[in-house]
């Protein structure tokens, strides 16, 4: 027989790190090319105009612009990046005058 009581093991004692998923840039925010827009598991949000998708379903901006969240059909959502309206609307005064 053992002279000392053996210590019992426990099956607890682990805690994994958070995955930090979710929307990282919201609608109307200005983003640079390469900025991560959404980190997700599966395609809760689908890529729209000027948005790429990574191997882990992360959505990222392909151009500098403004983020827009839109509907894609009845049930799906998509994220797009468009050029800011101010850059398109405001032209140099010399170009307008001539």
From Swiss-Prot:
SUPFAM superfamilies, A to Z: Ribosomal L27 protein-like
Skewed-composition ranges (Polar residues): 7-19
GO MF: structural constituent of ribosome
Keywords per UniProt: Ribonucleoprotein, Ribosomal protein
A GO BP annotation: translation
GO-annotated cellular components: cytosolic large ribosomal subunit
Coiled-coil region: none
Chain segments carrying region Disordered: 1-22
InterPro entries xrefs: Ribosomal_bL27, Ribosomal_bL27_CS
PANTHER family: LARGE RIBOSOMAL SUBUNIT PROTEIN BL27M (PTHR15893:SF0), RIBOSOMAL PROTEIN L27 (PTHR15893)
Family: Belongs to the bacterial ribosomal protein bL27 family.
Descriptive protein name: Large ribosomal subunit protein bL27
Biological classification of the source: Bacteria, Bacillati, Cyanobacteriota, Cyanophyceae, Nostocales
């Amino acid at each position: 027989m053992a002279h000392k009581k053996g210590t019992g093991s426990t099956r607890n004692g682990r805690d994994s790190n958070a995955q930090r998923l979710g929307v990282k840039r919201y609608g109307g925010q200005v983003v640079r090319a390469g900025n991560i827009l959404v980190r997700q598991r599966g395609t809760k949000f689908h890529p729209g105009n000027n948005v790429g998708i990574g191997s882990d379903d992360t959505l990222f901006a392909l151009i500098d612009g403004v983020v827009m969240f839109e509907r894609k059909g009845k049930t799906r959502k998509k994220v797009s990046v468009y050029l800011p309206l101010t850059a398109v609307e405001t032209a140099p005064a010399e170009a307008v005058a001539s």
